[in-house]
């Protein structure tokens, strides 16, 4: 019989420290985004969603939904197997071709999530090149950290976005190397000096691996990300279909031989049921639509700037960055949860508290993600209510 005590102790400690996670029960109604329905403990009411990663609202777009309906009626609900055993459909192949085309790469490979894509790819690279040294940005995502850990390769950590520190590590480590970093960091919203990192990595003949999860669909002429925007060539790109493209799944792109080796050697890819063809159909439609509609990228940046300006106008400090992400640092987990609850329960504003372990202790925050569909009225209303909630919870700014 399982002893419940150690598990309950963990939960009690999380609750006491303010780091216990509560999953809010919401329903997003098609055509109403960013308004949603919240099934709260005391009532059911409309809320305005300020923390969705469906950055462009493509998860609600009629073209995406219609293509998924068609695929559902044509191919059924599930893939029916792993990619090797009956789970590769025309929809999977078409989507992988489109992703390779988007990033101007030779090949692409789908995964069930971008987390899975990162962890599995990095782990498998370690199997293929056992003496590979991974050089990782100190702010990299959990999926990257886990991938490096499971690779069993040596790793060095360079200071966040510090090209000089990166070069010193590259210089002192001969042999095969891979520099792993992100383009847009999801919690602070800062953008890496991608061009400089790639240049110094190439100087020392290192493989470059970039996570563009919070950039694909949002930056670059066709939405291929920061690499496209900055006109730079990277060896391996990790991306997602679940944020700007509004559906589900992750992927990697790169040289044909590299992708084929990962496909052939990655256990977590080989032994997993593949994405539903319905998901693939929706993602393919979304990518093509977003590629052809740069006004969506322009609008989300304009909405982010507007949101930052209005928050600062009220005397509230916003963490400075050049991206679409709007972080407001609270600096205390209990207060962060309290402000979030005030906004949700009293004001109908939904922004999830971001606490440890997602961010470092002492940097707890509310992370706002304005979309092209947040109006001026939404922004003004949220900012006034945020200021009041901060005051009621004992934080003036």
Question: Which ranges hold each PLM region?
Answer:
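Structural motif of enzymes handling amino- and sulfur-group chemistry
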Residues: 274-293, 299, 303-305, 312, ...
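Conserved PLP-binding catalytic core of the aspartate aminotransferase-like
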Residues: 298-305, 312-348, 363, 370-372
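Conserved N-terminal alpha-helix of the aminotransferase class I/II PLP-enzyme fold
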Residues: 65-113
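N-terminal "arm"/small-domain region of PLP-dependent enzymes with the aminotransferase-like
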Residues: 2-6, 10-75, 206
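Active-site phosphate-binding strand-loop segment of PLP-dependent enzymes
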Residues: 54, 156-210
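PLP-dependent enzyme catalytic core of the Aspartate aminotransferase-like
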Residues: 58, 62, 66-70, 74, ...
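Conserved PLP-anchoring active-site segment centered on the Schiff-base-forming lysine
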Residues: 121-142
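Active-site PLP attachment segment
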Residues: 222, 228-261
């Amino acid at each position: 019989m399982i002893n419940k005590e150690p598990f309950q102790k963990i939960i009690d400690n999380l609750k006491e420290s303010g780091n216990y996670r509560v999953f809010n029960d919401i329903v997003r109604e098609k055509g109403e985004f960013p308004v949603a329905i919240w099934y709260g403990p005391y009532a059911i009411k409309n809320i305005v969603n300020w923390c969705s990663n469906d950055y462009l609202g493509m998860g609600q777009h009629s073209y995406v939904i219609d293509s998924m309906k068609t695929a559902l009626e044509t191919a059924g609900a599930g893939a029916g197997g792993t990619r090797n055993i009956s789970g590769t459909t025309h929809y999977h192949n078409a989507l992988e071709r489109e992703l390779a085309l988007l990033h101007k790469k030779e090949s692409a490979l789908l995964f069930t999530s971008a987390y899975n894509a990162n962890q599995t790819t990095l782990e498998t690279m370690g199997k293929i090149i056992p003496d590979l040294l991974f050089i990782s940005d100190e702010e990299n995502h959990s999926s990257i950290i886990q991938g490096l850990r499971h690779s069993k390769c040596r790793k060095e950590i360079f200071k966040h976005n510090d090209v000089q520190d990166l070069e010193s590590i590259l210089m002192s480590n001969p042999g095969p190397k891979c520099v792993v970093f992100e383009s847009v960091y999801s919690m602070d919203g800062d953008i890496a000096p991608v061009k400089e990192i790639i240049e110094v990595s190439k100087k020392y003949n290192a493989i470059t691996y970039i996570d563009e999860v919070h950039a694909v669909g949002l930056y670059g002429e066709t939405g291929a990300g920061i690499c496209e925007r900055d006109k730079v060539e990277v060896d391996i790109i990790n991306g997602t279909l679940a944020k700007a493209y509004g559906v589900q799944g992750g992927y990697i792109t790169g040289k044909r031989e590299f992708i084929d080796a990962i496909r052939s050697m990655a256990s977590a890819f080989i032994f997993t049921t593949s994405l539903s063809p319905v998901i693939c159909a929706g993602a393919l439609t979304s990518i093509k639509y977003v590629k052809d509609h740069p006004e969506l990228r322009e609008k989300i940046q304009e909405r982010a700037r507007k949101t930052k300006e209005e928050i600062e106008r009220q005397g509230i400090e916003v963490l400075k960055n050049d991206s679409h992400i709007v972080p407001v640092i609270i600096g205390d987990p209990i207060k962060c949860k309290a402000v979030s609850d005030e906004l949700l329960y009293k004001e109908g504003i939904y922004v999830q508290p971001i606490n440890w372990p997602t961010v470092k202790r002492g940097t707890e925050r509310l992370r706002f993600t304005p979309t092209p569909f947040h109006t001026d009225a939404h922004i003004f209303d949220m900012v006034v209510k945020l200021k009041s909630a901060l005051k009621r919870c004992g934080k003036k700014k």
